[in-house]
Amino acid sequence: MEKKEKNIEELVVFSGQYEDCADNARIVIPDGIEEIAENAFRGFTYLSEVVLPRSLKRISACAFAGCSNLKRIEMQFGLEEILDEAFSSCSSLTSVNIPDSVKRIGEGCFEACASLSQIKLSESVVMIGSGAFAYCFNLTDVTIPDSCVLVEFNAFANCFSLEGVKLSCNMGLIDESTFEGCRSLKYVDLPTKLVKIGRRAFKGCSSLANIILPVGTSVIGFDAFADCSSLSRIAIPKDLREIEDFDAFGGCDALTDISFGGSREKWEDIMRGNILTVQKSDCSVSVPKIIFMNLE
């Protein structure tokens, strides 16, 4: 029996197809649809709930952007990609359960979802785009599964209520400004394969009190921990080879203890040309069991 080919109209929801829906509408996308096109529901302020079919593979860029009354989105296993700004500025959305089939979350995907307090990420996600969850003011905790190898810059910037983060063990980089401005952040479970902490990665995380960098961490970027005003202790492994600028700890007024796992000579090599801008005059750096210098 010959297989019937489907028309593009049978596979894709295009912009404008649901414009005549009533206020507080609940839309069920029919089975067979494989893609929701770019801008398909953008700015549909009457939309309150969307149920997506198992056949859906892709939610395209800005598909639901600016749906300010959207409270619930039901995604099904089979979805593979959620592209750039797909749900940005959906300010009434409170929780999202991303199915385990999703491998990519695009740039700004849930940016400025101000009411979003709970997010369950796909256990298969490989990449989270820049700014994906930035300005999600009510998000309190996040676990990035071990399938993920890349979280791009600004991904969780200015999530003011974020208190705890568990990062994928397979992330080698915490990118620029990933958690910048997360002023409630108290706990970070860092990746065991971490190599570099990027510029401003934790800048302004004013509730962060203690950081233990894992073995293998070799680079701390400019302003990485700047203005972490509660940070009192940081433990640095012997693998460290570069602090891009010691403004990495600028404005860390409570910092009194920097523990370094390597030799005194190696620390002095790392510090050559850097100026410690920690204000506390009693801040000390120690190698195992030996306090070897006072930094003023």
Per-region residue spans from a language model:
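Short, glycine/charged-enriched secondary-structure capping and boundary segments
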Residues: R42, A65, G273-I275
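Structural signature of tandem-repeat unit edges
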Residues: M1-V12, C21-E35, T45-R58, S68-E81, ...
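Consensus positions within tandem repeat domains that build extended binding/scaffold surfaces
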Residues: G16-Q17, A37-A40, S60-A63, L83-A86, ...
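Short, aromatic/basic amphipathic alpha-helical patches
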Residues: D247, E268-D282
